[in-house]
């Protein structure tokens, strides 16, 4: 059996490319999504492959980023949002908890919100205490949310692909220290 070894970041990138190639309704956006550094390398080359309409940056307003995603999902889009730090998602909790997580229940299972919210966790260089928290347990206690945290590249790719296909919101945690690990 010959398995290709990838970094965690390349596995995320590969999953995004695969999902976006298979379904033109998959959109990837967030702060830095179209940046030359590509959110720790995870979105590199996506804008060139899929264009500005499907891979784009947005103004810094986490609540609006998330609300936009919910709106797109109601138009049958599957969105992948990236918040480069988990703490930024706290500014979108109203949308995540009161809208996305409850939408399927509020509509008797007739409408879903197929969004993936990628949250980067872990301390980085020069990061203060406001940018180095692990808030997984907060999200794990919200009915209607699925919470994922892959420990290796192989699992990250498979779990991200599954998350994108899920009909309901998924919080996808990525530890920044894992992005350059190989598995």
Regions found by a protein language model. Name each.
Residues 2-178:
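Thiamine diphosphate
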Residues 180-183:
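Glycine/aspartate-rich loop-and-adjacent alpha/beta segment that forms the canonical ThDP
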């Amino acid at each position: 059996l010959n398995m290709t070894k990838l970094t965690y970041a390349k596995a995320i990138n590969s999953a995004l490319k695969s999902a976006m190639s298979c379904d033109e309704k998959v959109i990837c956006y967030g702060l830095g999504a179209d940046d030359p550094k590509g959110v720790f390398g995870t979105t590199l080359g996506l804008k060139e492959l899929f264009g500005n309409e499907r891979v784009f940056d947005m103004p810094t307003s986490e609540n609006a980023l998330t609300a936009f995603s919910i709106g797109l999902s109601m138009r049958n889009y599957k969105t992948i949002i990236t918040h480069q730090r988990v703490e930024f998602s706290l500014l979108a909790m109203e949308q995540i908890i009161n809208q996305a997580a409850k939408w399927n229940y509020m509509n008797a299972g007739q409408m879903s919100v197929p969004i993936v919210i990628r949250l980067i966790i872990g301390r980085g260089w020069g990061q203060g205490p406001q940018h180095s928290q692990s808030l997984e347990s907060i999200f794990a206690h919200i009915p209607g949310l699925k919470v994922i945290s892959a420990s290796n590249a192989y699992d990250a790719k498979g779990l991200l692909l599954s998350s994108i296909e899920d009909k309901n919101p998924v919080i996808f945690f990525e530890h920044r220290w894992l992005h350059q690990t190989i598995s």
